[in-house]
Amino acid sequence: MKCNALALTALVSAVSAQAPAPPAAPVPTGYFSVISARSASPIHLLPLQARGGKFYLGGAPPSSYCPVEVVGDACPPGNTTVLVGGDKTLSMGVVVPGGQEVYIGPDGAMSYTIAHSVFVPEGSVRDQWSREAPATPTQAFGYLHFETGFVACPSAGNATDYQVFGQVDGAKFGPECLGFNMLAGTFPGSSTSLKKNTG
């Protein structure tokens, strides 16, 4: 009887060791906006803003454009930076031919392509993005990740915003720069209501 119990235990252990891991949570889809998370810091809960081809935490609203002559009164306010993707690649949530890709430049700066252009500087990182769903259905935020993490540094001459960087080889950050997480929340809108960002 002892032998059978040991054999059964060994069999159960072997089967559980072979059981496939539960599937990872699906990558969220759709449009989303981002705020920063770094408790007890000047960047905690600041919105991510796209301006002039780069990304910032806080400061002025995003730079955007809506062709009133084409869209008329349907132009949205353009005061929120909206993203889409996060399954290796990332883009701005805009309606413009070719879209606007988000990448980490060779200097580490989180950047985006200008409208109607696919140019990305040589040495940029384009495919290390991932998006994580909220841990439970009651949580409002998931995460946007860059494989090696994010850093925010005070903008030159501006105490109200911080430029966002990805931690890449060769990029140097001073002690005034802060590592942080990006909290991703679903954006209630459709692509047709989003403006293109100006460079």
Label every PLM stretch briefly.
Residues 1-21:
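Fungal secretory targeting signals
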Residues 4-9, 81-82, 88, 192:
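Intrinsic-disorder/low-complexity peptide segments enriched for small residues
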Residues 6, 69, 78, 155-156, ...:
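General secretory precursor processing signal
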Residues 10, 59, 67-69, 145, ...:
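Residue-level signal for mature regions of secreted extracellular proteins and peptides
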Residues 15-18, 37, 85-87, 93, ...:
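Compositionally biased, intrinsically disordered low-complexity segments
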Residues 19-56, 105-199:
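Extracellular glycan/ECM-engagement signal in secreted proteins
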Residues 51, 57-108:
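Short, well-structured hydrophobic secondary-structure segments
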